[in-house]
Every structure is written in C-alpha cells, then in structure tokens.
Amino acid sequence: MAAADTCGAGTLSSRSVASEAGQGGTSSFQRKGKASGGPGGGPRLLSIAGTRPSVRNGQLLVSTGLPALDQLLGGGLAVGTLLLIEEDKYNIYSPLLFKYFMAEGIINGHTLLVASAKENPAKILQELPAPLLDDNSKKELEDVHSAKTPEPNVNMKIAWRYQLQPKMEVGPVSSSRFGHYYDLSKRIPWELLQSSKWHGFFLPEHISPDLKGESCFLSCGYMRLLEFIQKSVYAEGFDGANPQKKQKNILRIGIQNLGSPLWGDDICCKENCDNNHRLTKFLYILRGLLRSSLSACIITMPAHLVQNKSITTRVRNLSDTVVGLESFIGSERETNPLYKDYHGLIHIRKIPRLNNLTCDESDVKDLAFKLKRKLFTIERLHLPPDLSDTVGRSSKQDLAASTARLGAGCSSMAEGKKHLDF
C-alpha cells in the first residue's frame, strides 16, 4: 500500500510540474540542439563561421568552395572527414577543386594547412581565385579580417539585413553565406592572405638528404607530415580533448599529389612493391586525427598512375568521400560532337555514410564539368538534340526532287504507260 501511495505521489507531482509549466507559458519539450550547455541541458550545436549543421544527420558541414559539389555531397563536407580527389590524366582540373577548398577557408576565416612535395605552399595560396562578392559583402569581409574588433551591434545589423534578402545562385554573393563563387581569372587579394592564418608544409624543407627516417610502417615524408599535422591540431586546440580558449574555428587541411614518387612512395612505379602499405597506414592515422578534431581534409592523388589497382581500392575505402575527374584531353571524346559542350566527366565514387547505414546516390550519376573563363561548373550530362538534315529529316532540295519525280510518274500514267520509272 505504501508503494502504491509513493507511486501515486510521484504521478501527482509530475502532473503538477507539467501543469505549472503549462501555466507559465513554457513547454517542457525542447528542440534538439537548442538546449543550454549547462547542467541538465542537451548538447549545444557549435556556431562556427562558415559551417552549418546537416539536415540529414546533424553533422557539422563546411563548404568545398564549389556549391554544386556541396549539393552532390549532401550539403557539404562533414567536419572530421576526408575528401579524396582522384586527379585527371594531365592534372589540369583537379588543382582547381583544391584551390576552391582553400579559398573558401580564407573567406570564412578558417585556419589553413597546405602540404605539398612539388610546389611551395606560399605560392599555392597566392594563386587562389578571388571571390565574387558585391560591394556590401566586400565591406563586411574587410570588417571580418581587419585587425580591429568591430562592434557587436554593427555585425548584427549587417547580418540581419542580408539574411532577409533573396540570394542568387549565380553572380556575387554575401560573405556570410555558406559556399561562395570564385573568379578564376583573378587572384585573391593580398590583404586577405595577410589577415588569414595558415601553415605550410613543403617536403624538401623538412627532409635532408642524410636524414634516415624510413621505417617499416611509414616513409620519411609521411612521418614528417603526420607530425606536422598533429602538432598543429594539438597546439592550437583543434582537438576535442583540449578545447580552444578563444572562439572555436575550423582547420582546413590540403595535401597535394599524395602517393606520387615526390612523397617517396613507389606505388606509381611498381605493381608489386614492398612498401605498398605505407600510404594506407598514413591514411589510418590521419583519419584518427580528423575524427577527434575540428578539421576537414582534402587530398589529391594520381590514381591513374597507381600500378596495383588493389591499392586504389583500399585508399578509396579509407576515404570518406571520393571524387574522380576524367578529362577529355587526349581521348576520343575530345573530338566527339556529343561532348563538345564539356571538358570532362566527374565521378562521385563514394559518399560518406555518417551515422547512417546507407546514403542517397540518386543524384550523383551522369555528371560532367565545364571550365569557363571565370567559373568551373558541374552539370548534368545530356545529349544535344539531333538537328541534322541527314538523320530523320529531308532537305528542301530532296523534297522538291521527289515531288518532281512523282509528278512525272503520274503524267505518264495519264498518257497510257503501264510502268512507272522510279
């Protein structure tokens, strides 16, 4: 009986609390992510410039710098994931995706880490494309990257003004939006580069000829690069274990030509090499760093040069997102009139399955890219209409000739001839 009284009292107390909450005008239900981060509250979504939560799985997303590619990847690139770009045959178009990713980080004030074994990172950043911004957005961007801290009410006024205006998908856009467009014919302003924070890893500067750092697990270049990335992640508080004291930010990592002989790897030279596991070991450790930090990584790799295709399959399995570029240069499709409006095909080989068993791959097929004077665009591949006169359509001359022959035949029938000459 006492237990029943206790149970009844608990039910009564919960009902009274619910009634008091209803009388107070507040609901006891709270939307996910809107709860406070204090004791008893739910997790609070991070508010970082240049990011937004995914509507599918709640993951924090960053833009790749190409809005069309963001749409194909489910809204953007998830923080803590790896994007692999399989280079085209002559490495003409894949560096553009790399530069888009880096330029997007500068516009949003993210920290960059550029690693290359071929070109100096400072030179790579100087060749980034300039953003397409209107006059008001340029003023806002200067306020964000200036050394002086602007007043909070001024920032709120600018953000409130532009978020109510409809945004066009082509042309200049605001710097506060997710994803921007860039002008490939212009270079990013020097003022933005000076105000941005970046780290450069140039392999020849970190390896001396007499240095013996080879191991049975990793090459010397991979070891130095992992140490450099790990130091940047931990020193500046991008890892979750050591939160940043200041406002949280995103680390964008870009690695060029990974797996090529420039990195000391021989998977592009031999089919059965003894050290074919070094690249996969590197990706294992790198993904562990990404998963536990506020960072996103893009890697370009010459997959067409890898002799053993099983290595390419393993690298794809170790990547969260895989995008391949197929150029028409030097192929039969370059002179094919069906592909005259495009410069190559883009293959979305893998889409991340984060907190899901499956992913939607319905909109990632039959894609082509086109390089214009200022823009790199991704379009749905379609065949042009057949308007030729030889296929399914007669010309006026042929039609007139057939009419004349038909008229002559009919006149001969009228004169009593039994046979018609066709």
Curated annotation (Swiss-Prot):
Pathway: tRNA modification; 5-methoxycarbonylmethyl-2-thiouridine-tRNA biosynthesis. The keyword tRNA processing applies. One of its GO terms (cellular component) is cytoplasm. InterPro entries: Elongator_complex_protein_4 (IPR008728), P-loop_NTPase (IPR027417). Residues 1-49 are annotated as: Disordered. One of its GO terms (molecular function) is phosphorylase kinase regulator activity. It is found in: Cytoplasm; Nucleus. Pfam families: PAXNEB. Keywords: Cytoplasm, Nucleus, tRNA processing. Its main location: cytoplasm. It comes from the Eukaryota. Expressed throughout the cerebellum. GO terms for biological process: regulation of transcription by RNA polymerase II; tRNA wobble uridine modification. Belongs to the ELP4 family. Component of the elongator complex which is required for multiple tRNA modifications, including mcm5U (5-methoxycarbonylmethyl uridine), mcm5s2U (5-methoxycarbonylmethyl-2-thiouridine), and ncm5U (5-carbamoylmethyl uridine). The elongator complex catalyzes the formation of carboxymethyluridine in the wobble base at position 34 in tRNAs. Component of the elongator complex which consists of ELP1, ELP2, ELP3, ELP4, ELP5 and ELP6. This is Elongator complex protein 4. It comes from Mus musculus (Mouse).
